[in-house]
From Swiss-Prot:
It holds the Pfam family NST1. Residues 76-90, 971-981 have a biased composition (Low complexity). This is Stress response protein NST1. Residues 1-15 have a biased composition (Basic residues). It comes from Kluyveromyces lactis (strain ATCC 8585 / CBS 2359 / DSM 70799 / NBRC 1267 / NRRL Y-1140 / WM37).
Length: 1299
């Protein structure tokens, strides 16, 4: 509010309206002008309503006594002092008066707030009143007043205290009889409650009877007071408002009223003229108590809502004009209202006389409107009661909307229901009582009139009452003296209404009061005059203010002044809400103690102003006394008997005592409440003082802090300035340094750029120079490459020419050698033919002879054995070559034996003939072309049918590695194949021997032989059955002449040599026979004693099974110079010479020594030597021993008999692996289908007596098909064969070169 007015003040200054500023400012709270100054402890600066500044000292106590305030106000003393602006004392007095009025209106609010703030225990402490406290209060109350009324003791000789004590005891005993648990506190609370209820009843009684007395009685009662008429009217209004039910409180209950309900009231045409902002207060709980929640909700739903609360505030100008017009029409409206009474009084006679409804309703409606709207107090009370009891509002709405049809029907039904006799009795009693209590100054009603009136009642009470009312209205000159009969009639009419449609009895009483006010329109001249006076003063002041602020703040001013205009009504309305709250608490189910607390608290407000002003207390007391005992006072003044007991009976005295006790209790409670309020206010003042002191201390500290902060800020500012200077200086220095660095960096960058330019130019020059050098170097390299290519091409051409030349020479040489070989072969063939003839002859001679003791058995005769001479020559040639290879015969023997053992191991270890290796140094490819040509010529010069035993192509070329190059035999051996075919067993040649010389010697030796002496005959003419079975039997392959170290006794050397062998084969397309490895080669592919499936001959003496065998002339079985017997003798003599003690002699030594004893050395070969030793077993007891490798190494002859002798070489002692190996070999050889016969005849030689004791087996390819022919013949005589697979013990074994 203050800020809003300040803004208006500023706007006024801008417009230059300085004169309007003083009128616009109204009440403004005191405020401190200088906020920065220290808080004043003894005074405060305020601003007056006219805008002047005043200075006042702080009040020491806010709760000053009202008497002091009144004295100060009357004396005109003010606590303000003028300021420099020249403020006058008149302004101070006006401000004090305004403050005093505000304080008077704030007292009930303060007490209400204080009572609500108290706790339950504090309320109980206030309500706890003992008997002693009560009587002390009565004594002090009597001593304070020197009144001679009946309550205070009109006779001094009477002991009023004792009488009151007796009354108190009687009342307490009666209360104890009702409730035995009642104590003094509960008794006092009940008295207060009864006082509350009795005050309402007294108010109703006074409204019906007391106020209808002569006005002189009221003036006499008012003459008992010492104050002026204004105080009398104020006290009267205060007393009336204290005993009336109070529905409104300006500070508390008004906030609880709903705006919607107020807006709905403002829309009603009956009460909208009397509606004021803040004068209407409604609590919904009151309606709930009287009507129930559902009915209240239904009533509230029918109330229209109003969105604008400001519509309830009327324009003041219009209100003033309306007020004036209402005053002028008051008399006429009251007269009109009285004329409307007879129709209401005729309600009981509705069955007899029924008036016009339209006329009656219109008159009643007009009467209600005018009465309610004409007088402010009636309208205000009617509004309050309408809000408290919604049925009144409903009746009013029915009168407004339905023209009173519902009310009329209700009244008629209620009146007709009442019994006529009860109505008569009540009317008679009321009339007698009114006549008795009538003022003597009033005219006395005659007995005849009363009798007639009584008779009229019997006959037609309504008609009589209507006639009396009309008569009284006509005779009355003014509203000041209404007729007693009329009042009695109205009272009797109102009392006759039962109001059964209202549940609450209080509501019934309120309705009766409302109807009484409406029908009687009793006189309130004094109140109206007082209101007129106040309204005139307010009106004058409002006119001045409206004229001043008409254009600026009319709305604000109207609200403020409207609140001030209602201040005079707060005495009558201040506690309405409190008593309503009390009624609510009484009816809402609180406990008795809480109900009593609220009732007593409501009663305390009745005498608030009496305590505020000590001078008003006796006035109020006498007012109450005279109101309660007005009839008694009048009687005493008129000369009635002074005896108190005779005047009042015991019941009246008891009632008076009850009232006095109730008043005393109320005063006592009021005193306690005020004391509690003062204590609380004192506590608040102390707290506020402490808070102010604390605030002052805090303010001082805050100032000190501000000073310190200011100093710190200054210091900080200086420090910041100093830092800024230093920072600026530092920044300048850094700027200089930065500029220097930038200059240096620019210089460095310039130099770097210049250096880069120089380097770039140098780099470009270097690149150019390097490119030139690279180009020159590339050209030189290209020239050098071209030169080298030319030289390389030239060298290649030269090499090609040289190779061509060499090849040409080689071909020429080979051609020459082949020519020579052919020539030699032709010569040899001629010799062979000749030798064959000789051998045939020798074979025929020796065909029937057998050598006993030789295990070879007999040899069948063969007509083709005439080539023995040729065989002997060839055998001698081989012996010569063997001698030339090694000087030690034992070495050859050991090699031969090792070869046979290794062959046997090869068969046991899963090896075959194809896995045999020979040293590469001994291959035929490394032989000289001349030697190879000699061998090739020798083989090619023979006829195919005659050279089958020398050169047979194997059927399984893949098995013997046919893709490998051919190899040649060792020097000193016969060529084993034609055209470079390989041998199965390679010779272990000594690397120290010159192979070329040996081959040349062998070639020259063969030239000298008589190989061409062989006579060739037709092989087809020879029958197959004439073949020698020995020749047909297969023989194991031997490598005797393929091993140069035959007499080497070292088994490790033999094994190592055997592991280094390798076979290379080069098949010849023109030949289909397997080449022979030696003259004893029978082919490893065939089984011993079984004819080959590919028509291989078993040896050089055998022939294939498919063709007649031609006699082989390789060796002869007889030597021309020496016989077998001579060999045995030579060997025996040699043994005796070497071992006189009959010990074992090495075989090689024996063989070498025996050769020296024989003339023809070429005749005795090592195999013959072994055969001879074997044949000497029986004749000379020969014992042969094997070495660690299983070869024959030692021999012993002599008288020592052989314990077991040599094992019989039968077919049971066969080698276990021979058959398996032969079968695997036979399986591969059988693939060859072309039979090739051997044209050579079988010679008779030293090997002719050797027969293989092998059983003929079939190959896997011919399983189940045994080969016919000689196989059966061989198997038929097992005694003629030697078991070469026999394993001999280490102590004694007999073997040969194949074992």
């Amino acid at each position: 509010m203050v800020a809003h007015k300040k803004s208006k003040k500023k706007s006024k200054k801008q417009h230059g309206s300085a004169g309007e500023k003083e009128l616009h400012e109204s009440k403004i709270h005191a405020e401190i002008i200088d906020d920065e100054a220290e808080y004043p402890t003894s005074r405060v600066i305020k601003r007056a309503p006219n805008g002047d500044v005043i200075v006042e000292s702080l009040p020491e106590e806010e709760s000053l006594d009202r008497s002091e305030l009144n004295q100060d106000h009357r004396s005109g003393s003010s606590s303000s002092s003028t300021n420099s602006g020249g403020v006058t004392n008149t302004a101070d007095c006006n401000a004090d008066a305004d403050n005093e009025e505000v304080e008077d209106t704030k007292w009930p609010i303060k007490l209400d707030t204080h009572w609500e703030s108290l706790s339950l225990e504090e309320r109980r402490n206030i309500l706890r009143i003992s008997k002693d406290e009560l009587f002390d209060m009565i004594k002090s109350y009597k001593n304070m007043h020197n009144c001679d009324c009946s309550m205070c003791g009109r006779h001094n000789n009477l002991n009023i205290e004792q009488e009151i004590e007796q009354i108190y005891c009687e009342l307490y005993d009666s209360a104890r009889e009702e409730d035995s648990d009642t104590d003094f506190v509960q008794f006092h609370l009940k008295l207060i409650k009864e006082y509350q209820n009795g005050s309402n009843n007294t108010h109703h009684h006074m409204r019906h009877h007391g106020d209808k007395q002569d006005s002189n009685i009221c003036h006499e009662n008012f003459a008992h007071n010492d104050n002026d008429d204004n105080n009398d009217s104020t006290n009267k209004n205060a007393f009336l408002s204290s005993i009336l039910p109070k529905e409104k409180n300006a500070s508390t209950s008004e906030n609880e009223c709903t705006n919607d309900f107020l807006d709905s009231l403002s829309e009603d045409s009956a009460i909208k003229y009397c509606l004021s902002e803040g004068a209407i207060g409604l609590d919904k709980s009151y309606q709930v108590d009287f009507l129930g929640k559902e009915e209240v909700d239904s009533n509230m739903d029918t109330i229209p809502n109003s969105d604008n609360k400001t519509q309830t505030a009327l324009d003041w100008k219009h209100e003033i004009e309306q007020f004036k017009s209402s005053k002028q029409k008051q008399v006429s409206e009251s007269t009109t209202g009285k004329e409307a009474l007879p129709p209401i009084n005729d309600i009981d006679n509705t069955n007899e006389v029924i008036p016009e409804h339209d006329e009656f309703d219109s008159k009643l409606l007009h009467f209600a409107k005018t009465v309610v709207s004409s007088h402010p107090h009636i309208a205000e009370e009617f509004i309050n009661r309408a809000m408290m009891y919604p049925h009144i509002k409903a009746i009013t709405e029915d009168m407004m909307n339905n023209e009173g049809e519902g009310l009329k029907r209700a009244m008629e039904s209620l009146v007709l229901q009442q019994e006529l006799q009860d109505w008569r009795e009540n009317m008679a009693v009321s009339i007698e009582k009114k006549i008795y209590e009538m003022d003597p100054t009033e005219p006395v009603i005659d007995v005849s009139e009363s009798d007639s009136h009584e008779n009229e009642r019997v006959n037609g009470p309504a008609n009589a009452l209507e006639e009396n009312n009309k008569k009284d209205v006509i005779e009355s000159d003014s509203l000041d003296r209404p007729s007693l009969v009329d009042n009695n009639k109205v009272d009797s009419l109102i009392d006759s209404i039962p109001f059964k449609f209202v549940k609450d009895p209080k509501a019934v009483a309120s309705l009766k009061n409302a109807f009484y006010d409406i029908f009687t329109n009793k006189t309130r001249r004094s109140e109206i005059d007082q209101d007129d006076k106040e309204y005139k003063e307010e009106l004058e002041r409002l006119r001045n203010e409206i004229s001043a602020d008409e254009d600026q703040a009319s709305y604000e001013w109207s609200n403020d002044e409207y609140e001030e205009s209602n201040d005079h009504d707060e005495d009558a309305e201040g506690y309405v809400d409190d008593e309503c709250i009390d009624d609510h608490h009484l009816d809402s189910g609180y406990d008795d103690e809480n109900e009593d607390e609220d009732i007593i608290y409501d009663d305390l407000h009745e005498n608030v102003k009496l305590n505020e002003d000590p001078s008003a207390v006796p006035n109020g007391h006498t007012q109450l006394i005279h109101h309660d005992n007005s009839v008694t006072s009048n009687v005493s003044e008129d000369g009635i008997d002074d005896n108190y007991d005779s005047e009042l009976d015991h019941a009246e005295r008891l009632e008076e005592g009850r009232r006095l006790i109730q008043i005393a209790i109320t005063k006592l409670l009021q005193k306690k409440l005020i004391a509690s309020y003062q204590e609380k206010e004192a506590e608040k003042n102390r707290e506020r003082l402490l808070m102010e002191l604390e605030a002052e201390e805090n303010q001082k500290k805050e100032k000190e802090k501000k000073k310190l902060k200011k100093k710190e800020k200054e210091k900080e500012k200086k420090r910041q300035q100093q830092l800024a200077k230093e920072e600026e200086k530092k920044r300048q220095e850094e700027e200089e340094i930065r500029l220097k660095k930038e200059a240096e960096e620019k210089e460095i960058a310039r130099r770097e750029a210049q250096r880069k330019k120089v380097e770039e130019a140098k780099r470009k020059n270097d690149e150019k120079r390097k490119k030139k050098l690279a180009e020159q170097r590339r050209r030189e390299e290209e020239q050098e490459r071209i030169r080298k290519e030319k030289e390389e091409q030239k060298r290649q051409r030269e090499e090609e020419q040289k190779q061509k030349k060499m090849e040409k020479e080689r071909k020429q040489r080979e051609f020459e050698e082949q020519r020579l070989l052919k020539k030699k072969e032709a010569e040899q063939l001629q010799k062979l033919k000749e030798n064959q003839k000789l051998n045939e002859k020798s074979m025929q001679k020796n065909q029937d002879t057998t050598t006993e003791g030789v295990p070879y058995g007999s040899v069948s005769t063969n007509p083709l054995q005439n080539n023995s001479t040729l065989n002997d020559d060839i055998f001698n040639m081989i012996n010569e070559v063997s001698k030339s290879l090694s000087s030690s015969p034992s070495r050859n023997q050991n090699d031969l034996l090792g070869s046979s053992v290794l062959s046997n191991v090869d068969h046991q270890g899963g090896l075959n003939a194809g896995n045999v290796f020979i040293p590469p140094s001994l291959s035929m490819s490394e032989m000289s072309p001349h030697a190879q040509a000699g061998f090739n010529t020798l083989g090619s010069s023979l006829q195919p049918n005659l050279l089958n035993g020398w050169d047979q192509q194997s059927s399984t070329q893949a098995y013997y590695h046919a893709n490998q190059p051919s190899s040649s035999e060792a020097p000193g051996l016969l060529p084993l194949s034609h055209g470079g075919s390989s041998s199965k067993f390679s010779s272990f040649a000594d690397t120290t021997v010159d192979v070329t010389d040996d081959v040349n010697n062998l070639t020259s030796f063969l030239k000298d032989t008589t190989i061409n002496d062989i006579s060739l005959g037709s092989t087809s003419s020879i029958p197959a059955q004439n073949l020698d079975p020995v020749n047909m039997a297969p023989r194991p392959q031997s490598a005797v002449y393929n091993q140069p170290n035959l007499w080497n006794n070292d088994p490790n050397q033999r094994l190592s040599n055997f592991g280094q062998q390798h076979v290379q084969q080069n098949p010849i397309s023109s030949s289909h026979s397997q080449p022979r490895r030696s003259i004893w080669d029978t082919g490893a592919e065939n089984t011993f004693g079984v004819a080959s499936a590919n028509n291989f001959a078993s040896n050089i003496w055998d022939t294939p099974t498919s063709t007649p065998a031609l006699p082989n002339t390789l060796l002869s079985s007889q030597v021309a110079a020496t016989s077998v017997d001579s060999y045995e003798e030579v060997l025996a003599k040699t043994y005796k010479m070497l071992s006189p003690d009959n010990s074992f002699v090495p075989l090689d030594k024996l063989y070498q020594t025996s050769l020296t004893q024989i003339n023809a050395k070429s005749v005795l070969s090592y195999p013959q030597f072994i055969s001879t030793l074997v044949s000497m077993k029986n004749s000379y007891n020969t014992e042969l021993l094997n070495d660690n490798t299983g070869l024959l190494a030692y021999c012993r002859m002599g008288s020592v008999p052989v314990p077991s002798g040599l094992p019989s070489y039968n077919r049971q002692n066969t080698f276990p692996h021979a058959t398996t190996q032969v079968q695997s070999d036979s399986q591969q050889i059988n693939s060859v289908s072309t039979p090739i016969s051997n044209p050579l005849p079988q010679p008779s030689s030293v090997f002719n007596d050797v027969h293989y004791n092998q059983t003929a087996t079939t190959s896997p390819a011919n399983h189940g098909n045994p080969i016919p022919g000689p196989t059966s013949t061989i198997a038929s005589d097992p005694s003629n064969f030697v078991n070469f697979g026999q394993s001999y013990p280490n102590s004694y074994q007999t073997g040969n070169i194949w074992s």
